[in-house]
Amino acid sequence: MKKIINNPDQFVDEMVEGILLAHPDQVRTPGDDRRVLVRVDSPAPGRVGIVTGGGSGHLPLFKGYVGKGLCSGVAIGNVFSSPSVQQCADAAKAVDGGAGVLFLYGNYGGDVFNFDLAVDLLELDGIETRTVLGCDDVASQPKERAKDRRGVAGIFFAYKAAGAAAERGDSLDEVAAVAQKVVDNTATMGVGLSPTILPTTGAASFDLPEGEMEIGIGIHGEPGIHRGPLGTADEIADQILDSVIPDLGLGEGDRVAVLVNGLGATPLEELYLLYRRTHQRLEELGVVIERRYIGEYATSLEMAGGSISLLKVDDELLELLDAPAQSPFFREA
């Protein structure tokens, strides 16, 4: 294992400290617990707060999307581990400006359990909440069980749209409805080429022989749907799109936003090869590509591989995607 770290047990805390030192104009800690970060201007009276959270190891997910026009706060867990109930509640309290708080995070058992308990604590304090779960990973469950799918890179679209809705003054129910609309129209699938090495143990998160790939792998190394010889960029994109396109029922005249995401150790050049084939496939179908995002949006430490997310859009969602936003890891002018 080769990593640029100090004490593995302090990996997350030192990383958070680095973010705070590098971006004091955008994020801050509301209290003594540095596992809770909020926008520097939170709380804002009358503005709906949006709180996300989850395990570390996925930057810029989750903590990298705290900022203007995005999330208001984040609860930070250890690597691949859920934040505590108290951290989830503290993040919500710190961003509540009287308009309520939307919890928007990926659909993972530990996160759901702790955030749900935080909702109970917040009710005692009179803070109104709503919850929307990112569940865009089409490999994790069939279409008829879409609400049980894992949340992966496609949650970026929900952050962006819901954050813009909150910024323009929408109510809590309206912001939650925007987030749910995005979730209902987003589909993602990934491919893994090499495992993540956990900083605390030095152990690989899964085994993948040299020369093989795994289609549908999760961002924690959860098993995919197909393992076999490494394909070409076009073959990989086709395998992913053969699941993602029909999942959304895309056809001629439909409009989409495309996100090609790197998982941590994949060169940007290779992501553009995946985008190239994605563009070709959608163009052949007569699907209009309205927006394109290529880069690292949800990683898994140094896992090699990538994912393709498609969001079916309309005029409302495009307006929200184009609204100004700024966080340590994302900017929309």
Q: What would you call each of these model-derived segments?
A:
Residues R168-L273:
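Mixed-charge interfacial surface used for oligomerization/domain docking
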Residues V74-V79, E123-D148, E284-I289:
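Short, acidic/small-residue loops that bind anionic groups at enzyme active sites
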Residues M1-I50, D315-A333:
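N-terminal amphipathic/basic leader segments beginning at the initiator methionine
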Residues V112-G126, R145, E270-R276:
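Short Gly/Thr/Asp-enriched flexible loops that form oxyanion-binding sites at enzyme active sites
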Residues L133-N185:
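Short alpha-helices
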Residues S243-A333:
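C-terminal non-catalytic interaction/assembly regions of soluble proteins
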Residues K2, V48-G55, C71-V74, N78, ...:
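Short glycine-rich or small-residue beta-strand-to-loop segments that form or flank ligand, phosphate
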Residues H58, F62, G67-G98, I245:
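Glycine-rich oxoanion-binding loops at beta->alpha junctions
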